[in-house]
């Protein structure tokens, strides 16, 4: 579910996640929640995963959400070379993991000349920007999915009678 191709959308406000190829029960303390398996699509992989470090899957999923939100806003992936960049496309593509590892990305469609957010171009998208900028950060500074769910842009957009409930049942 870590890439746009794994999301199925319909004519109503329904999104179905697919390709849930790897999952793991999150253990209770004192057992470590850290994972070591390299998985997922490179374009959506968090820096710690690409660098072979032990990682918390919840945090790398948060990173992948940031990549998805950015892609939906910008119609491009955040770590691809900027449109119009000169050079061999294969060499530019080969640099993508390096840009991910350095958290080197910028806005394009909503950017000013320096790649920073332009309030005029991004009017009405500030909440989405805050989510993306909170997710595409190094692991120690990245917001959790619970933090993102509590952000007004997300919280106020979800209207489910009775509210959303998290299921904590273990599936056999």
Ranges and model annotations:
Residues 77-140:
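C-terminal lobe of the eukaryotic/viral protein kinase catalytic domain
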